């Protein structure tokens, strides 16, 4: 009995040991798949293991790994649930919450992401991932609120239900050929990628026909294999074709290389490995310098800054040099991928490490005078909450394509971007200054610094109608509004240095010629008539009115208070009126256009609605001697000050300027 008992225990122990060994073996296999970046395959293997694990802590660790697989494969929504479970573990909370925050960013929920990053920092103040993630999320919110002229829309002629990415254009004067990568159903391979769980990507092309319509998308069967091809780069006016091709054995990714194909009788033929690195290494995403002597690409190679870097290789006859790193001007400890060289001084790429709006962002680098690259995040709308990469920019136009899995995408989609020309407009109304009534049939003349002139009589029959003019860029404008019986209206503005569309809106208020206008704040010393410097500065605005209305003849009148004799006040006011006209003459206004008249105290002021600022001086009050005597001493001084004034009145509007 004891022998049987011991034998049974031994068999159970051996069985448990065998099960544990089998599970450990499967776990190692799943870990190896993950290390090989076969994330979808690893996810399936971890999921199978999870069902057989009883230990709670081990289950949570596997849940976290499943979340990582989904995240790295781009299935962010599916990654949320396993990360939430892992976040309950003290040991995994920080990593899991950081991932959850990154998922919220991918979904465009920046405020939720900010909350999660802050929760991590409350527990671990020096966590680099949370600190940089928080900075990026806050920066992204700012970017969405900045104005932009760029229009971006999905390139429906290139997109399918699968992943479509990395376009390259053979620019042919309106008959563009667009080459791109896709995992669509028509892709050649029958097996599924261990990385994404989708079909392997192939190369495809479509082109504009002579009617301006896109032809059906076709696969490049001469270059496609059973495995991944992608990231095309057209060069030499459509005669050379660079692309990435990857091989796999027994379902395992064996790395990627850059190939070059030649166009023969209209077909891409003779694909050849450039041989930049050995087959044991992996490189991809080629772009070529304008002279064809450099190939830039992305790779994880020894001597880099961490993650994937941008490297280049130089052509030596029929071979290519060993890779050289582009340096810290471009590369970081994160991933730099998908380079595109537009010209010798403009270089695009995507990065995860510079402050981004989420995942990969597109950056542009300009070569400065010191030979160094200066990088800038292209901001919204080039970048978004998702991964943005694979940009192609037309050589001589502000338009192109990019790839994104932003909101509204079905996986990775290709988007078309354009920068429409700046639009500037002038619009507005013309009203009577006093009555605020619409002034109909005004003549508006618009003068541009480029020598242009537009003139139109504007009919404004009701409050909803406005005058409208289209304007040019980088131009200074003066517009003049004229109407019989009114002073001319004038204003200046410029479209120079403006980077965004703008409508200049003006409500032009014209002042009637049939009224006396007080020139405010013209002050004289007691009993004197010489103009003070502040008074001259005020009179300059009236000089401008005379210049802008060259046909008017005016009376410039001076008035005094009632202190002193009638005779002395009359003489003083005449001298003051003469001082004003003399000043106008010194500014170039002909004497024939002015009449100086001193009225002394004979025309006391009548308070208008504009002057009724004192409760003891209501509108309509005449400031004569009897009224002033009825006021207190302090109030009398105010009333006397109101009577001391310079006024302007239009006598005629038919003056003909001299031709001299």
Model-derived regions, located:
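Short, conserved micro-motifs composed of acidic
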Residues: 72, 99, 106-112, 116-429, ...
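Periplasmic peptidoglycan-binding/tethering modules of Gram-negative envelope proteins
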Residues: 422-553, 592, 614-616, 636-639, ...
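Structural marker of alpha-solenoid helical repeat scaffolds
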Residues: 52-55, 89, 123
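Periplasmic OmpA-like peptidoglycan-binding domain that tethers envelope proteins to the cell wall
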Residues: 351, 356-358, 559-660
């Amino acid at each position: 009995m004891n022998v049987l008992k011991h034998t049974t225990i031994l068999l159970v122990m051996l069985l448990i040991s065998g099960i544990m060994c089998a599970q450990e073996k499967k776990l190692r296999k799943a870990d190896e798949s993950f290390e090989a970046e076969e994330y979808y395959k690893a996810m399936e293997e971890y999921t199978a293991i999870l069902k057989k694990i009883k230990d709670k802590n081990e289950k949570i660790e596997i849940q976290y790994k499943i979340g990582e697989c989904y995240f790295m494969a781009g299935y962010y929504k599916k990654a949320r649930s396993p990360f939430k479970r892992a976040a309950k573990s003290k040991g995994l909370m920080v990593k899991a919450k950081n991932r959850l925050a990154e998922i919220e960013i991918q979904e465009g929920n920046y405020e939720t992401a900010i909350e999660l990053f802050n929760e991590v920092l409350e527990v671990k103040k020096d966590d680099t991932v949370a600190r940089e993630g928080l900075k990026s999320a806050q920066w992204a919110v700012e970017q969405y609120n900045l104005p932009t002229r760029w229009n971006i829309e999905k390139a429906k002629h290139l997109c399918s239900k699968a992943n479509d990415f990395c376009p390259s254009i053979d620019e042919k004067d309106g008959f563009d050929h667009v080459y791109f990568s896709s995992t669509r159903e028509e892709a050649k391979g029958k097996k599924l990628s261990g990385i994404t769980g989708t079909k392997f990507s192939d190369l495809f092309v479509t082109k504009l026909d002579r009617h301006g319509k896109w032809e059906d998308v076709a696969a490049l069967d001469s270059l496609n294999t059973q495995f991944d091809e992608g990231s095309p780069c057209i060069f030499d006016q459509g005669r050379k074709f660079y692309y990435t091709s990857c091989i796999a054995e027994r379902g395992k990714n064996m790395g990627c290389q850059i190939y070059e194909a030649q166009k023969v009788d209209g077909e891409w033929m003779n694909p050849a490995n450039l041989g930049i690195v050995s087959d044991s290494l992996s490189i991809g995403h080629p772009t070529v310098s304008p002279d064809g002597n450099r190939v830039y690409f992305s790779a994880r190679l020894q001597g880099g800054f961490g993650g994937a870097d941008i490297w280049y290789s130089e052509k030596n006859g029929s071979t290519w040099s060993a890779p050289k790193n582009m340096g810290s001007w471009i590369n970081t400890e994160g991933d730099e991928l998908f380079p595109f060289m537009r010209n010798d001084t403009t270089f695009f790429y995507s990065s995860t490490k510079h402050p981004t709006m989420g995942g990969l962002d597109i950056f542009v680098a300009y070569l400065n005078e010191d030979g160094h690259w200066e990088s800038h995040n292209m901001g919204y709308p080039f970048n978004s909450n998702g991964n943005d990469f694979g940009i192609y920019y037309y050589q001589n136009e502000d338009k192109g394509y990019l790839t994104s899995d932003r909101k509204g995408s079905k996986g990775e989609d290709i988007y078309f971007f354009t920068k429409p020309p700046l639009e500037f407009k002038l619009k507005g109304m013309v009203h009577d200054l006093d009555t605020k009534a619409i002034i109909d049939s005004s003549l508006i003349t618009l003068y541009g610094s480029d020598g242009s002139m537009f003139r139109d009589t504007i009919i404004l029959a009701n409050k909803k109608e406005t005058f409208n003019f289209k304007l040019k860029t980088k131009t200074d404008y003066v517009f003049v509004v004229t109407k019989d019986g009114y002073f001319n209206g004038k204003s200046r503005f410029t479209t120079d240095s403006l980077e965004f569309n703008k409508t200049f809106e003006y409500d032009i208020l014209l002042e009637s010629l049939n009224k006396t206008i007080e020139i405010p704040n013209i002050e004289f010393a007691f009993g004197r008539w010489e103009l003070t410097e502040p008074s001259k500065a005020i009179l300059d605005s009236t000089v401008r009115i005379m210049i802008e209305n060259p046909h008017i003849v005016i009376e410039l009148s001076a008035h005094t208070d009632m202190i002193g004799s009638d005779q002395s006040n009359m003489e003083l006011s005449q001298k003051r009126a003469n001082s004003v006209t003399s000043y106008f003459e010194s500014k170039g206004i002909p004497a024939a256009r002015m009449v100086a008249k001193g009225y002394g105290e004979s025309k006391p002021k009548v308070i208008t609605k504009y002057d009724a600022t004192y409760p003891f001086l209501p509108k309509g009050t005449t400031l004569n001697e009897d009224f002033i005597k009825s006021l207190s001493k302090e109030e009398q001084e105010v009333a006397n000050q109101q009577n001391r004034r310079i006024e302007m009145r239009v006598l005629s509007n038919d003056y003909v300027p001299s031709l001299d």
